[in-house]
Amino acid sequence: SIYLRVDWPWAVHNSPLVSMGWHPESGFINSDWKGYDEGMIVYILGLGSPTHPIDPAGWTAWTSTYVWMDYYGKPLVNFPPLFGHQYSHIWIDFRGIQDAYMRGKGIDYFENSRRATLTQRSYAIDNPAQWRDYGPNVWGFTAVDGPHDTTVVIDGRSRQFHTYSARGVAADYVMDDGTLAPTAPGGSVPFAPEIAIPALITMREKYGDNLFTNYGFLDSFNPTFRLPIQPHHGHVVAGVGWFDGDYLGIDQGPIIAMIENYRSDLIWKTMRRNPYVVAGLKKAGFTGGWLGN
């Protein structure tokens, strides 16, 4: 009943794009959902509403802001942090279904997320900035906390570190300060299990209880940050690196949900039966696969 009461057209401030937020004191913020990211599900839900739907032109406007570029030999819709390639996919099974944009590219959004995952690993193997521990099974860049906002010289090289940041790598943007996130490979298990699962296992074995304790993986870690200064939060383990002290639901949820989607399609199967999701996908122009024509 909450979903049926949502006034989606009200949230379309700069038509036909959906606004990212509104404050009672100041009104709409100066940002809309555009450029490929986690906002995909916002448009699907808005389109599928049986009571207050948005105009399908919103989806066309949304896809018109995509950035399609090659990265590490793979053409894809770019978005640097992996969360943008994961969050909508937790709920919606994009395997085998395509909108007009993806039909034009010859892939689906699931394959796009697979490519994004593969390019992150390729970047870590390449390791152009020579951060510690990066490699085939130690990788993962997304929006997480970091150790400190500071610039220091380590082994003769200037290193800039950050606290919270939308870390990520793509053809048009790289934000990398040596901070890695287990939720990045964890949320990509269905897309590329052959690299995501070994990454999780390696992180668990290599860093032990520093990274994986009572409730699973901590938010993030940075093997390069081994400085004798107090981090913004978390702690430094001598000779190993910095480890965050927080468990975040927005980390644990994607790990658990995507592993279960990989195992049993549980969430995907449930959402494929939701008439509003199906309606939203069809209004966005999706066809094929489990949706049919």
Pin down the residues of each PLM region.
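Ser/Thr/Asn(+Pro)-rich, low-complexity disordered segments
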Residues: 1-293
